[in-house]
UniProtKB/Swiss-Prot annotation:
Record keywords: Calcium, Metal-binding, Repeat
Domain (EF-hand) ranges: 9-44, 60-83, 92-127, 133-162
Gene name per UniProt: cbpF
Organism encoding this protein: Dictyostelium discoideum
Residues the entry annotates as binding Ca(2+) 2: D105, D107, D109, K111, E116
Pfam families, A to Z: EF-hand_7
This protein's name: Calcium-binding protein F
Chain residues that bind Ca(2+) 3: D140, D142, D144, C146, E151
Phosphoprotein in keyword set: no
Binding annotation for Ca(2+) 1: D22, N24, D26, S28, D33
Length: 174
C-alpha cells in the first residue's frame, strides 16, 4: 500500500522530469522535447543528443507513441528509485547490521544467538512470523544456530531490495 509520502515523492519526480525536458513549457513531454533538451545540455552535439534521447525515449515511452504520459514517467521514476535502492542496499544493510549488533550482541562476538535474536523481536514488539524459530532458520544460512553479521547483512539487503521491487511493481497510486 502506498502512502501519501510515496505519492508525493513520485509526483515531485514527475514534475522534475517534466521541468527538465518540457522546453516549450506546454505541460507535456514528447520525444522531440527530450531530443531538444539533450541537444541544449550537450552543447549542440547532434549525435550525442540523438543517442541519449533515443535511450531515454525507449526507456520511458512504453507504448512508443512519442508522448510521455504521467504513468510512463512515474514508472520510470519508480524504476530509477528502485535501482538506487538496489545500489545502496549493501551499504545500508551494513549499517543496519552494525546497529543491530551494537544493541543486541551482548557478548560482542559478531553473531546473534537465539536468545539475543529473540531480544530483537521483543524490542520491536512484534514478529513478522508467528514462530521466531522460523525467522532464525530463514536467516541462519549455515544452520549453526546463530546469525552471523554476514547472514544479517544478506537478510537486510534482501529485505531492502524486495521492498524496492514491490514499490516499483506497484507503480504510482494516483
Amino acid at each position: 500500500m502506498s502512502t501519501n509520502s510515496d505519492n508525493d515523492k513520485i509526483f515531485q519526480e514527475v514534475q522534475k522530469f517534466v521541468k527538465n525536458y518540457d522546453l516549450n513549457k506546454d505541460g507535456s513531454v514528447t520525444s522531440f522535447d527530450i531530443y531538444r533538451s539533450f541537444l541544449k545540455k550537450m552543447d549542440g552535439d547532434i549525435f550525442k543528443a540523438s543517442q541519449a534521447a533515443g535511450v531515454l525515449c525507449s526507456t520511458v515511452d512504453m507504448d512508443h507513441d512519442g508522448k510521455f504520459t504521467y504513468q510512463e514517467i512515474a514508472k520510470y521514476c519508480a524504476d530509477e528509485a528502485k535501482k538506487n535502492v538496489e545500489q545502496n542496499a549493501e551499504i545500508a544493510a551494513l549499517a543496519d547490521v552494525e546497529a543491530m549488533l551494537l544493541r543486541f550482541d551482548k557478548d560482542k562476538d559478531k553473531k546473534l544467538t537465539k536468545t539475543e535474536f529473540v531480544e530483537y523481536f521483543k524490542g520491536n514488539g512484534h514478529t513478522p512470523y508467528s514462530d521466531r524459530d522460523q525467522v532464525l532458520k530463514i536467516i541462519d544460512l549455515d544452520k549453526d544456530g546463530c546469525v552471523s553479521a554476514n547472514e544479517l547483512q544478506e537478510w537486510f539487503k534482501k529485505r531492502r531490495i524486495d521492498y524496492a521491487r514491490m514499490v516499483s511493481a506497484r507503480g504510482p497510486n494516483c
